[in-house]
């Protein structure tokens, strides 16, 4: 009589396993359905691949599978100002946050590099300006072309986020614990007024501690909500300038990723509901779904800023000049891809030489930025072009820009130069409408 009992026990175990598998399957279908329904909230904007350029040497190496880039996937992340009423993801505003994300496909290691917004680079068609102006010239295609051709990259996908998305996701995650300096507290409180107005979210000003002798020393700890943490990311008038601003942004991104990885499913769904409408990406539903399961295994281990070696040229305020672009690109590829012997392309070499020509040579550069504060006209656009007689700043001409090198400057809003009368200078629609920016 023992055998039938044994078989009965075995059947019960198998039945229990089948129930568990069925529940997991149903749960998987539920999660899949929830994810798919939320994917519709993102703004999918495929890149016009005809407008995205890659340097010839880089493309040849990729085609021959003889490139260190083949083991990695590289994305461009852009942050744009959400304060303008006519703000569009496609262009007409500067991308004041530009981050390169390199993903090692084998180790799942992620590295982030911020491009300093005032870095003088070739935006395309031998027109040189601050890096953050590329997005205003021709949307994500032009911004990615700038990154690819100046830095020898092969970026084919991107995501653009409105700044108020940052405040929203931080609030959804319950805020962030941040160590700050006295100077950062002062500037953060100032930015909070405008950030709260722009996002419609609330905050409580942090009461200033007694002013210390060293105002730049990080020695105070606070729990920041979305408005406060976003304002913290906007600070660029401490001694560390834009380098400190981008470092703060990368720090906040790392903290968000860590908290999101440890959040429950309901909280993740809530974040998707709130934030996805504020995101535009070239990635389709299936692309995003393929990324989501592996995100748990990813870790942001290292971050940096670009250029790593730079000086300042005080043109209409201040611009950051790579010294020189070739060596900076070598360091970039060493950091992102582990290639210590990378030889930059002829395009990078030519751009490097032209950048130094524009600023009058390395001897005209300063080790420090001379103007710090609201009086600094770093928001003013500089557009350097060479008509054969030398480099001149044509930013005051109000002319249109040939984004695709076709000879046509009348092809729609991506080509249109927009003067901003708010600053007394000629700007693209930017963060120059008030506040500390």
Name what the model sees in each region.
Residues 2-108:
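Entry/capping segment at the start of metal-dependent catalytic domains
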Residues 54-65, 72, 86, 269, ...:
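C-terminal solvent-exposed extensions
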Residues 66, 70-71, 171-267, 411, ...:
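Flexible, polar/acidic helix-loop-strand segments at domain edges
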Residues 70-73, 93-98, 107-115, 126, ...:
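Extracytoplasmic
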Residues 78, 84, 118, 145-154, ...:
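Structured segments of extracytoplasmic/periplasmic soluble domains
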Residues 84-90, 128-137, 152-157, 219, ...:
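Second-shell loop/turn segments in exported
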Residues 97, 128, 140-148, 163-167, ...:
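Extracytoplasmic/secreted envelope proteins and their assembly/folding machinery
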Residues 137-206, 282-284:
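Amphipathic, coiled-coil-like alpha-helical scaffolding segments used for oligomerization/assembly
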């Amino acid at each position: 009589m023992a055998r039938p009992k044994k078989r009965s026990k075995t059947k019960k175990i198998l039945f229990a396993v089948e129930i568990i598998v069925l529940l997991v399957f149903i749960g998987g279908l539920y999660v899949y359905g929830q994810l798919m329904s939320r994917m519709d909230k993102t703004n999918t904007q495929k890149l016009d691949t005809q407008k995205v350029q890659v340097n010839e040497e880089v493309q040849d190496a990729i085609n021959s599978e003889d490139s260190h880039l083949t083991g990695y996937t590289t994305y461009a992340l852009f942050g744009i100002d959400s304060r303008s009423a006519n703000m569009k993801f496609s262009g007409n505003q500067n991308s004041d946050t530009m981050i390169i994300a390199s993903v090692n496909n084998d180790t799942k290691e992620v590295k982030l590099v911020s491009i300093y917004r005032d870095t003088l680079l070739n935006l395309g068609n031998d027109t040189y300006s601050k890096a953050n102006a590329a997005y205003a010239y021709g949307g994500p295609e032009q911004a990615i072309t700038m990154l690819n051709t100046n830095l020898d990259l092969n970026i084919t996908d991107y995501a653009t986020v409105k700044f108020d998305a940052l405040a929203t996701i931080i609030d959804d995650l319950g805020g962030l614990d941040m160590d700050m300096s006295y100077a950062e507290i002062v500037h953060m409180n100032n930015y909070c007024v405008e950030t709260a107005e722009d996002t419609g979210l609330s905050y409580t000003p942090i009461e200033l501690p007694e002013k210390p002798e060293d105002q730049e020393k990080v020695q105070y700890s606070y729990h920041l909500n979305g408005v406060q943490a976003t304002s913290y990311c906007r600070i660029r008038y401490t001694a560390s300038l834009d380098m400190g601003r981008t470092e703060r942004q990368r720090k906040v991104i790392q903290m968000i990723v860590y908290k999101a990885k440890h959040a429950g499913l309901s909280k993740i769904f809530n974040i998707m509901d709130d934030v996805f409408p504020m995101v535009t990406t070239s990635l389709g539903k299936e692309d995003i779904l393929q990324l989501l399961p592996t995100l748990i295994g990813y870790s942001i281990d290292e971050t940096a800023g670009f250029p790593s070696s730079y000086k300042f040229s005080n043109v209409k305020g201040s611009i950051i000049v790579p010294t020189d672009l070739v060596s900076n690109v070598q360091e970039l590829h060493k950091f992102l891809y582990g290639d210590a012997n990378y030889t930059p392309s002829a395009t990078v070499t030519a751009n490097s030489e032209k950048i130094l020509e524009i600023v009058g040579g390395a001897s005209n550069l300063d080790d420090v930025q001379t103007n710090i504060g609201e009086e600094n006209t770093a928001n003013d656009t500089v557009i350097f072009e060479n008509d054969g007689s030398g480099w001149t700043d044509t930013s005051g001409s109000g002319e249109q820009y040939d984004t695709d090198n076709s000879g046509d400057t009348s092809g729609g809003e991506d080509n249109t130069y927009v003067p901003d009368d708010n600053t007394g200078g000629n700007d693209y629609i930017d963060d120059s409408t008030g506040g500390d920016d």
